Amino acid sequence: MEQFHATTIVCVRRGNKVALGGDGQVTLGNIVIKGTARKIRRLYHDKILAGFAGATADAFTLQERFEAKLEKHQGHLMRAAVELTRDWRTDRVLRRLEAMLIVADAEHTLVLTGNGDVLEPEHGLAAIGSGGAYAQSAALALLRNTELSPQDIVKQSLEIAGDICIYTNQNHVIETLGE
């Protein structure tokens, strides 16, 4: 099965701005299948950003389920996330899905895991995927030591992760919310 675990997704929040970005590489084992995949989406009337890592079909399934929860709860991010992860834990089919999501709106950044966790990370910073630790480290250093915008921090942290992680490329998609 095609995997997105070999990817990098990073989200940075500073002030009233948030940026979420990901690379475009998709691998099957140790072969690059695609270099221009779009793993970042705008949801619920462009008010919510979502990025995913994991098995491709699983990630798309979770994204669709999350969108349905957003519609049901009129775009309330936390409620939709909690309800999705509740289903994820209790549904026999969903429980087998191997993917993670980072979702963000104007106020919150959340990481949704296959274990049914809803995590709100510290420092307004979250990263997932095989290059996630590299991107998170770079982004944290940039947050602490520069005045760069969230978009610029995401871009630079993805570049650094791509220089280190063989499963992350330099083809980035970055979406932003806020002024």
Swiss-Prot record:
Which UniProt key words apply to this protein?
A: Allosteric enzyme, Cytoplasm, Hydrolase, Metal-binding, Protease, Sodium, Stress response, Threonine protease
| Gene Ontology cellular component annotations, sorted alphabetically | HslUV protease complex; proteasome core complex
- Specify the enzyme's EC class, one word: hydrolase
**Does the keyword Hydrolase belong to this entry?**
yes
Is Protease among the key words of this record?
A: yes
User: Which compartments is it annotated to reside in?
Assistant: Cytoplasm
Task: Please write the reaction equations for the catalytic activity of this protein.
Answer: ATP-dependent cleavage of peptide bonds with broad specificity
Which named protein is this?
Answer: ATP-dependent protease subunit HslV
Q: Which organism is it from?
A: Bordetella petrii (strain ATCC BAA-461 / DSM 12804 / CCUG 43448)
